[in-house]
Curated annotation (Swiss-Prot):
Gene name, Swiss-Prot/TrEMBL: smpB
Family stated for the protein in its record: Belongs to the SmpB family.
Name of the featured protein: SsrA-binding protein
GO cellular component: cytosol
Primary location class: cytoplasm
InterPro entries per record: SmpB (IPR023620), SsrA-bd_prot (IPR000037), SsrA-bd_prot_CS (IPR020081)
Any one biological process term the GO annotation gives: trans-translation
Length: 167
C-alpha cells in the first residue's frame, strides 16, 4: 500500500465507489431528504454487483410491517451463480436502517404522501449501500419548466464563453 492510501485510512476517510445511479429519479420527482441504507443481500448478488450488473432505475422502496423493502431493482446473476439457490433478479430486498429513521420515513410516506425512491447504489468500506430519497412526483409542466431552465443555463454559459473569448 502506498503512503497516501495509508494516510487516508488513518484519517478515517471512507472510500466510496458508485455502482449505479438513478438519473430518472431527479427528472421525475422532487427529491427532498436522503437516507443511506444497507442492503440485505445474498452471496450471488454481491458477486453480480461487483461485476456491475445492477440496475435501480425501475426500483422503489415501500414499508411493510414496520420494515422497508426495495422492489423492482434488478441484479442480474452471473452465469456461474450459486448452484444451491435459484437466483431471482427482481426479488424484494430488505433495507437496513435505524428504527428512528424508519419511523420518520414511515410517517412522511403515510401522512404526507411521499414516495421512497432509490437514487444511488455504491460501495462504502466494502459494504453495499443504497441512497434512498423522500420524493414527490413532478407534473408535466414542472418537467417542462426544468428543461427550459436547463436550456437557458446552457445558452447563458455559451454566450458568456463567447463574450469572454472576444474580449
Amino acid at each position: 500500500m502506498s503512503k497516501k492510501q495509508t494516510k487516508d485510512k488513518a484519517n478515517g476517510a471512507k472510500a466510496t465507489k458508485t455502482i449505479a445511479l438513478n438519473k430518472r429519479a431527479r427528472h421525475e420527482y422532487h427529491l427532498e431528504e436522503r437516507y443511506e441504507a444497507g442492503l440485505a443481500l445474498q452471496g450471488w448478488e454481491v458477486k453480480a454487483i461487483r461485476a456491475g450488473r445492477a440496475n435501480i432505475v425501475d426500483g422503489y422502496a415501500y414499508v411493510r410491517s414496520g420494515e422497508i423493502y426495495l422492489i423492482g431493482a434488478q441484479i442480474t446473476p452471473l452465469i456461474q451463480a450459486s448452484t444451491h439457490t435459484v437466483p431471482v433478479e427482481r426479488r424484494d430486498r430488505k433495507l437496513l436502517l435505524h428504527r428512528a429513521e424508519i419511523d420518520k420515513v414511515l410517517t412522511r410516506v403515510e401522512r404526507e404522501g411521499y414516495t421512497l425512491v432509490p437514487t444511488a447504489l455504491y460501495w462504502s468500506s466494502n459494504k453495499v449501500k443504497l441512497e434512498i430519497a423522500l420524493a414527490k412526483g413532478k407534473q408535466n409542466h414542472d418537467k417542462r419548466d426544468a428543461a427550459k431552465d436547463r436550456d437557458w443555463q446552457r445558452d447563458k454559459q455559451r454566450v458568456m464563453r463567447r463574450h469572454n473569448r472576444d474580449a
